[in-house]
Amino acid sequence: VKHKKTLKRKKAKVARKHPKSAKRPSRKGAKKPEVKTGPLLASGLQQKNSILILDFGSQYTQLIARRVRENKVYSMIVSHKITADEIKKQAPKGLILSGGPASVYDEKSPKCDKGIFKLGIPILGICYGQQLIAQHFGGKVRRTKEREFGRQELFIDDHSDFFSGLPGNITCWMSHGDYVSSLPKGFVSLAHTLSTQNAAFASRDRKIFGVQFHPEVVHTARGSEIVSNFLYRICRCRPSWEMGAFIKDTVSHIRQMVGKDSVVCGLSGGVDSSVAAVLIHRAIGRQLRCIFVDNGLVRNREPEEIKTIFRGNFHMNLDFVNAQSRFLKRLKGVTDPEVKRKSIGDEFIKVFEEEAKKIRRVKYLAQGTLYPDVIESVSATGSPSAKIKTHHNVGGLPEKMNLKLIEPLRELFKDEVRELAKQLGLPQEIIHRQPFPGPGLAIRIVGEVTPERLQVLRDADDIFVSEIRKAGLYNDVWQSFCVLLCIKSVGVMGDERTYENVIALRCVSSSDGMTADWVRLDPALLGKVSSRIINEVKGINRVVYDISSKPPSTIEWE
């Protein structure tokens, strides 16, 4: 009886604390928020001097953000569905409406809150964004007879502010199927091309500007200056965005979110994962445990280099896992690129989770995901951009994970990451290391991945990269690598007929990975590389050079 009375009193005490139930609320099954550290969460100091970019689905939206930031103004990409009230609360200095694949006269085309045009905030519309502005204010938008894509000559008719400091004509990049055929009342044309009369327009009283071309793309000459004019002459921004502030804000945010828990980071030795690891290590020190998974898909000498740099130089907790057999077993018989990526991503996470169980209080998985990683998989803001391919850092992961994600570089571009690496004190061999895909050499082998084919590719790639270094080109190009094709060709070596593999050389220039052009290498250099590969790598009798640009091709073959 005494026990029952005591139990009754305890239940009553709990009920007073939780009036709706005599039971303590269970935490089991509660969904934990995903942690994505980066500028969007660490931008308190920047919000009063920022530009909001409304994303209507353009593959170039992140390039707009990059152009703004390289002019030392903070930019945030938001959904086109953002309300005027939400924008008013953030009080940005200006708005940019991105391009997009839709047509403004389609019923299902994405639209923005019409209230944004009454806020008095300067607005720049690009391509679809320009057409949206024209339609809203009563102008007319029509479909072109033929889609205009590529370089066009832009003739500037007004140099007073938006085009201040530019010559009379420049090369611009066009990519559109619609055009503004007549301007709304109160708007004036600023520039034209031979086929587009209203290639740029303005309503200066409203501080609203629009361009049919893409100033954010490197193919537009002086495009960064056009963006700069909008930022400083129209929006009256101040130059305040720099990596020192980013480091301070992000380190503080990581400490706050992680607390006393531990973080596990998959370290590949590339600049992205390396910078992410060093940044997190600066925030939480020994609470970070890095894991290098030797999946058998890496280049020659990479494991040893990683040990030297991160154990020796940065004194990090670094574990090595030999999982070569697991990955090769998973890839046996697989030829589809998407299946390769997903299989490798899935196996990585399994390995990480197995290793993470050995670490006390681990709750977070760190990744070196960048802006281009996200846009190539799916729009970061849920906008209707077309999917290109599953990216190794985002799309290939299982939907259900036992660890929360920390992605401190998620909103940065590659050039910003390299600048960040310098300020964090990483060695030059990491800072200038060319991008290497998460699935490794598996997606540089067209067809099935086998130990024998991997070694052929490693040896050929080693020769090509070494010759690029000797020529003094390594730091000047974006990527240089070999691809092992799934075809064989007939050859003659000595007096015998051969039927062996083909290697493709790929060398591209780029500033961000979003667009790229093939490098015009010296034929003598190409000849030397070809001769060395054919003579030194067993199983190769032909070498070809890839002269495709992005777009329409991607940098990687798979």
Where does each model-flagged region fall?
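RNA-binding accessory domains that recognize and position tRNA/RNA substrates
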Residues: 2-36, 40-94, 101-119, 131, ...
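Extended catalytic-interface subdomain
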Residues: 367-369
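Conserved helicase ATPase motor motifs in RecA-like P-loop NTPase domains
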Residues: 123-129
